[in-house]
């Protein structure tokens, strides 16, 4: 039977993922820096013909981020990234993997002498496809739950405060959906869940250990629409920026380089240190 013909049931796949997670800590005792990147893959990101430049640039930025981080000898072992793509539905988050692990998988898959069949079941790379509408709240909740589960896996293993980055081009379509329990809207529930992890002192500065959450949006070029998008995203508590930030069209690659440098700065610091973010001027749209 060829490798392509092998099909595993869900229990075996979960066992493979669990084994992979256990080996991660046995093979690499470094402190971990958990990062979740959330990619809006709704139709507006793809364009009506499915070939919008901003989605092409986002996918190139995704590859650039991995290539940049693997070059940093510290970040490649400490940064752990999970990716979430979303639209009407939210994809299963990819496994938390270090840039070094991703590089090892790519090298193994390029070696015809190695049996890498099991890698396709590990879910380490996002799938980019048109996912229609924009369930941003559900995507954020998925990110929070994914990090919480990862922190449980860490146990006493040293780690940095988690980081979440959201890239979108529009307003959420699930604000008024019912939240679990039915007593709140999904928007209200998401805000409260973020507040559990993003906390500020009396001067409005992020507290020590507070999570990083940065929502960025790609402007449409229509001032009113862009103002509405910014307002809708700025409802969420965020840090280090107090509101959503506009990502200048055409500078998406620069944004991913900025994320890479931010993650490298975090990974090369002590776990209790405040994060020093690089200057965002290369990607931030001015006067927004």
List each language-model region with its residue ranges.
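Short, hydrophobic/amphipathic alpha-helical packing segments
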Residues: 58-67, 137-144, 256, 260-263
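Von Willebrand factor A/integrin I-like adhesion domains
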Residues: 122-123, 208-288
